[in-house]
Amino acid sequence: MCAVQGFWHQACTATVSLPSKTLADNDPATIQAVGAAGTGASYWAVGDKIGIAVNGTFGGLTLNQTVYAFILGFNHNQSVEGNGIDFQFGKTADGRDIAFVQSYGSTGTGFCMNTTNTNSGGWKNSHMMKTICPAFLNALPAAWRNAIKNCTKYSDNSGGGSDNASYVTATTQKIFLLAEFEVHGTRYYANSAERNYQKQYDYYKNGNSKVKYQHSSTGSACIWWLRSVYATNAAYFCRVYTDGGAYSNIAYFSIGFAPGFKAA
């Protein structure tokens, strides 16, 4: 203790624990706090990955293994979506890009956008958003479920084959698919108004590969779903092809599932 102007003062010390600059060495609560503060880029880089134990059944796939989520961007589309660290599944431990597959190439089952061949109702009313994505969230550890923010995303939520700007509205969800513009940075098949509310993710803007491989057969490239409807077709949603290009696919086809989330 020391006396200052006649008063005795007790010296106090406090220990402050800073996040590790190695993403994988941090727990979900730390990543959440950094995301909420908007300071993720001070510690980590786009493309950094962290292993997450996925244990559950979603889209008919029962899985119990560690899959790596990687950083898509920091404070992505901040004026619409707020602070956070956006991630996508997935990668293998050695960094190979993968998507989940189940009954790959079949119809009406597995990772289909809808169980019948229609895009009516768009993203908001799709089987993918209403059933598969929540089931995937439930397959994540509780600590990660708590770290994931309800995220606002704009999409065509009507479908039906008309490129109508009024069809693009907001939804909130913890697990989402990426949109065509968020991956490619341009519009090919999606509603032409989606891009007015979206930004391309830095991970893809930086030139990283859009090709993904089947989680169960990592030598086999797979087509993977996007949440954007094919605006001028009543039965298709957008997808990324095995060469990384922009294409579309019938809604009840089972292809790759590569979900995203925001930690904040």
Residue ranges and their predicted role:
Residues 2, 7-264:
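Collagenous Gly-X-Y triple-helix signature in extracellular proteins
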